[in-house]
């Protein structure tokens, strides 16, 4: 079988049923527990099921059928659930909150506030952790997979003096200039945008409105909708 992916989705075979859940075949990693509360109805020994793998409070590999807001390698805007002397713990859709150590915070995180973070595996502890220092995880090299006018997915990262910084396609740094914003935009919003320019430094200029032919078609659709109201 392929190597298990911590902080990601895996398809694993059910090999044993116990009172407190199911054990799944983790290959060289050994059997992985899927606690009873997450066992799907009708699951039988020999079936393969998709599960998300993470470490429980005792740092043991465990499976869940819940879906977190994001997985390892992705960016997300997450709310702080609680803090202690080691860092902040963020809500990400699983029973165990996601840890963001103080060294990975740009400013001290506060309970109830939301922050854009990158999710990754800490090389020293092998834990799934978050980092608010997202710049180090953005790719500013050339973008062979992008072209001007292309529609892309955006995560609004932070406000700058000239516009809104965006994370483009969960990988690149982009900017929407203030004069290109014609609707309310909030920190942490996910939306679609369009590449208007690829700069020499690798960063992207983004617009929230279609460009070129797509802009004409969008305007035509809006006009037709208006005429039929």
Region annotations inferred by a language model:
Residues 1-229:
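Single-stranded RNA-binding regions, centering on S1/OB-family and related RNA-binding modules
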């Amino acid at each position: 079988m392929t190597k298990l992916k911590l902080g990601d989705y895996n398809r694993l075979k059910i090999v044993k049923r116990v009172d407190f859940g199911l054990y799944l075949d983790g290959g060289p990693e050994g059997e992985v527990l899927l606690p009873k509360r997450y066992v799907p109805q009708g699951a039988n020994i020999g079936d393969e099921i998709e599960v998300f793998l993470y470490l429980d409070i005792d740092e043991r590999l465990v499976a869940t059928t819940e879906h977190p807001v994001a997985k390892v390698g992705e960016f997300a805007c997450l709310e702080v659930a609680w803090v202690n002397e080691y860092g902040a713990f963020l809500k990400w859709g699983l029973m165990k909150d996601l840890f963001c150590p103080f060294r990975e915070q740009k400013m001290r995180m506060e309970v109830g506030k939301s922050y854009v973070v990158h999710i990754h595996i800490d090389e020293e502890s092998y834990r799934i952790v978050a980092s608010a220092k997202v710049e180090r995880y953005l790719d500013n090299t050339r973008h062979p997979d992008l072209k001007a006018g292309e529609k892309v997915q955006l995560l609004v990262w932070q406000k700058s003096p000239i516009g809104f910084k965006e994370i483009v396609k969960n990988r690149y740094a982009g900017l929407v200039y203030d004069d290109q914003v014609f609707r309310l935009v909030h920190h942490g919003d996910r939306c679609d945008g369009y590449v208007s320019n690829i700069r020499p430094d690798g960063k992207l200029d983004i617009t929230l409105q279609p460009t070129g032919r797509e802009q004409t078609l969008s305007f035509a659709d809006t006009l037709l909708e208006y005429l039929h109201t």
